[in-house]
Amino acid sequence: MYEQISPDTSHIRYEETDLSYLKLRPYRFKCGIYLICIQGKSIISTGVQQYAFDEQTELIFLTGSLIQIIQASADFKVRILLFPKDVFLKAILPIDTPYFNYVHEHPHYHHTADERSQNTWREIVLWMDVAQMLFKNNNTLLFRKQQELNFLQSILMWLFNTIPEKLAANKQYSRKQMLCHQFMQLIREHST
């Protein structure tokens, strides 16, 4: 049995858990949360959407979410990266708006058997290994704040590069949506 994870964090944290405490009731995460399933399977609900979450599956909520486990196998296990909103806002500045759009529309991804997808899976496991090395057990690193910012910015940029070009390029937006995206991009560019 694993300990319950705090719904918010002031620094990046890495955890491995079975999320069993999420079976009892929905749990609101106020921080960003990135999960990968390494064993077993479950159904995760956000109250609005349900996701089949099994081995080699990723789920990411950049600014938090309501999460509940609807059902899970006895061997269900995930690796989690939790990141505070303030670090996320600094890390995301150089990243374009289409990334937000894609992650908002597609927070769930199951890796397929093809070589590209399997390479991406191995790489995300490596990212989680680095997160474990740096951020497990609340290590007091000399340059922790800078390492958190660098790590989160790097993993977000890496994730952006894994987005299939066809999905990002073929999405048609209304004029109103395009103006909104351009406005948000201008805000991010000039907010520093």
Task: Give residue ranges: language-model regions.
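A hydrophobic/aromatic-rich effector-binding and dimerization subdomain
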Residues: 1-10, 70-137
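Generic protein-terminus/edge-of-domain signal
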Residues: 1-57, 64
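A structure-centric signal for secondary-structure junctions around beta-strands
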Residues: 30-31, 75-77, 145
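Short beta-strand His + acidic residue motifs that chelate non-heme Fe in jelly-roll/DSBH
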Residues: 43-45, 67-74
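A conserved hydrophobic position in a structured secondary element of the catalytic/binding core
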Residues: 61-62, 83
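Short, Lys/Arg-enriched, Trp-marked, Pro/Gly-tolerant hinge/linker segments that flank
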Residues: 113-118, 138-148, 159-192
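Hydrophobic alpha-helical core bundles mediating ligand binding, dimerization, or RNAP-core interactions
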Residues: 124, 128-132, 148, 152-160, ...
